[in-house]
């Protein structure tokens, strides 16, 4: 065999790019915090019991290697922007997109804790859609751009009816309305699990912090991000395409612009749900 060709083959073996984020992936992990390992030198944030943070860290993930599917069953392209997929349905309509997925996670958390009165989201016209009113049989009607409640059904606090409520919200709320509801996080040093980078608009986008860890020697925090996108698709844990060695983790160190695979945010876009 030609010596030059052998050298070429060896070059492919030893110099080909690898996927560093695989160093942090435990294929057998069944939740966010067991699937994505923390880099050396960092300690995972321990969320308080029954908090939104604990809920997200413990959220189930689909089998390693699962592809993100769109609402119509087609595979998302590009395929190289995520490392894991959350085990939650996307529905059969093109509704659960960017901000919708975040509202879904927040609502699912509150529903699972029977904190029904805290489930409410604003429509883009400013109307507040309270889950408890919906579950008690009230329905929302529209006259022009004005929304109002009418009593039209019996009370139903079932999970199926909860999903009906969310579908209604996804139809009339989005990144623009959610951005106005959330409160601003003043400093990246204060970021928490459950915080959201969001830009309201048409289109706008939003990603949520699923997990976080802190440096053992500095105030640096690293974090995982998840998103849905357009069209509606499975919620996915994003790669960090700007830092292959740290990916899928992101860092708040010297962060001015947050570049994710499919959207760019400013540090001032960080917000959170009001408690």
Give each language-model segment a name.
Residues 1-3, 8-23:
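Bacterial Sec-dependent signal peptides at the C-terminal "C-region" and cleavage site
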Residues 53-60, 109-110, 166-169, 225, ...:
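Generic hydrophobic, helix-prone segments enriched in Leu/Val/Ile
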Residues 76-192, 198-206, 211, 218-230:
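Acidic/His-rich structured neighborhood in mature extracellular/periplasmic domains
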Residues 18-89, 93-96:
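Cationic-aromatic interfacial patches
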Residues 221-275:
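Low-complexity, Gly/Ser/Thr/Pro-rich intrinsically disordered linker/tail segments
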Residues 5-7, 199, 215:
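Generic marker of residues within folded, mature protein domains
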